[in-house]
Amino acid sequence: MGARASVLTGGKLDRWEKIYLRPGGKKKYMMKHLVWASRELERFACNPSLMETTEGCKQLLQQLEPALKTGSEGLRSLFNTIVVLWCVHQGIPVKDTKEALDQLQEAQQKGKQEVAAATADGTSTVSRNFPIVANAQGQMVHQPISPRTLNAWVKVVEEKAFSPEVIPMFMALSEGATPQDLNTMLNTVGGHQAAMQMLKEVINEEAAEWDRLHPVHAGPVPPGQMREPRGSDIAGTTSTIQEQVGWMTSNPPIPVGDIYKRWIILGLNKIVKMYCPVSILDIKQGPKESFRDYVDRFYKTLRAEQATQEVKNWMTDTLLVQNANPDCKSILRALGPGATLEGDEPAFQGVGGPSHKARVLAEAMSQAQHSNDAKRQFKGPKRIVKCFNCGKEGHIARNCKAPRRKGCWKCGQEGHQMRNCTNERQANFLGKLWPSSKGRPGNFLQKRPEPTAPPIESFGFREEEPAQKEEVKSEETENKLYPQLTSLKSLFGNDPLSQ
């Protein structure tokens, strides 16, 4: 940060820190604004060391000014910062950014008047728009585009891969260029040949449209006059550099370079849309995303939209508020439609921070607690817990204080526990297994009524089945253990209900 902050020192730094950001505002320029401006210049492939001198600031302003019409708020803020820095280097006293812009406009007007006066006297040696310059004899000649400019353009394409900021960068680097210079810039792009093919198709369509709207006049060209350019001439394929310079410097001039650049920008817009398929309608702020990051994503996608400036302004006024998260949306609506982005930023500093996250977490936990309470209220009757050991309700066998019952609680046999029991039948309170093989519990009469149908005749040819033998044997055993009961009196003693 030390190298970035060394742009101003001593008295210049003191004057810098006394200038207000806005007329009537409270915030002033600080050292961090210089650091931010140097980083933004590197992002736009410009040299940050130019900020250290007056002439360097002037060159930066000449490159940034053409892109202001289609640039974002960040580009405009960078331009305003360089203007204030230029005033500090010049020693021009200003109070705020607006006064610095007025001083720059006055200086530009004076420069134009001096150039016009020198041209009228015939003693002008000031060059016109680069790359068409005047030689020592006063003739307008073409100066080829510099390798440094081509290197900056290639670096931008390689790093950004046709993101929205490539278009204003192309406009800044191709200011005043001829069609031949523009073709040189396009030919230096090595990769992205699919995008280059799309660009060629757009250029061919625009050239055909130009030929349709500007038909060739019949007859030969009068002597001393230049022929009218065709679409292929504007694209630089059928015209020489002398013809291009002649069209651009004739009276009235035919700006073939600007026309060709406009065609290229149309193609670049389509390429940017292809490389940025996200729609502006899909840009929504996350619940934990800061407002600054959301605005950056919003404007980056907005630059890739194929729409007029009026439509983009409507998108900014409507969608920026509509797609914000509930916290930021409430703040935006409270600020009203006249609020600026610079004034909105302090209002959203707490959103997404630790305190805000803690408050959101507390609200979420409170809502979850309320929902759990509501669910408990609508639950059914409480399930009754019963002990397997003593048979009483209100506790389980693990917490039972009664003596532990021996044997398995399921089948009644000893030697294993209920969880390891392999017997599918369960013992009832009389000790009999349930369900029994006969399908009747032990506290019911074990003998079934005999059928009224006559028995099957047996001629002695069939042996008694083993299953019938086992059934007879089990009946005899049960009759010995429990004699046949005709009433419950023998089981329960004197039962008044059985009398």
UniProtKB/Swiss-Prot annotation:
Residues 435-499 are annotated as: Disordered. A motif (Nuclear localization signal) lies at residues 26-32. Residues 460-479 have a biased composition (Basic and acidic residues). The keyword Lipoprotein applies. Capsid protein p24 is phosphorylated. Specific enzymatic cleavages by the viral protease yield mature proteins. The polyprotein is cleaved during and after budding, this process is termed maturation. GO terms for molecular function: RNA binding; structural molecule activity; zinc ion binding. A motif (Nuclear export signal) lies at residues 16-22. A motif (LYPX(n)L motif) lies at residues 481-491. The record marks F130, P131, L361, A362, N428, F429, F444, L445 as: Cleavage. This is Gag polyprotein. It comes from Simian immunodeficiency virus (isolate MB66) (SIV-cpz). The gene is gag.
